[in-house]
Amino acid sequence: MKKIIIPFVLLLLLSFSVQAQDAPSNDSDFNTWQARFRVAAVIPSPGDNLEGADVDISTTVIPEVDFTYFFTKHWAAELILATTKHEVEVEGLDLGHVWLLPPTLNVQYHFYSGDFKPYVGAGVNYTIFYGEDAGDVVGMDYENSVGFSFQAGIDYNLNDKWFLNLDVKQLLLSTDVTVNAGEAVIPVEVDINPLIIGLGIGVKL
């Protein structure tokens, strides 16, 4: 699914950015603060260092909010806030669930092309793991971690204040997990690397 979605979004953004180069500039056509409210699908690409066993992490749909501050017409910083719950399994063994809180700060570059305004961004996230449930084992412990974020999206103006938003982010996220299986304690390096696809509405503050 990712192999289809990512090239499609990149081609769409490229077409809008080419149009943006030819579009007339309006230096007053931005607000210092913006907020977006999205429904987002969080699609992990899990991996681990266990031989002969693959970890499986569930996809989930969540509400997401971000606040964007524009330094100039084109350059901005975006703080993304959301929390998500995932079920975890290894080869059919239920490892319960865990909640993730990954506040993410991206630096963005916004193109301007009439009512369509594509953007790209990159930044960092700090992921906090909480609310662990151990499932069929004695205990699970997830270590908080720092990772990178890459982003592309499009805003479409509905009027001078409100706009629609399509946003795609790739988080490079991994964690050290300690599995207490009762008779043994197993350290595991787990890659989560979620693709986050969001659709919603924004407002210029």
For each feature predicted by the language model, list its residue ranges:
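Outer-membrane beta-barrel translocator domains and adjoining extracellular loop/strand segments
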Residues: 46-53, 87-95, 130-139, 176-184
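N-terminal targeting signals for Sec/Tat export/insertion, comprising classic cleavable signal peptides
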Residues: 30-56
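Hydrophobic alpha-helical segments typical of transmembrane helices
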Residues: 63-66, 150
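Cleavable N-terminal export/targeting peptides
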Residues: 1-31
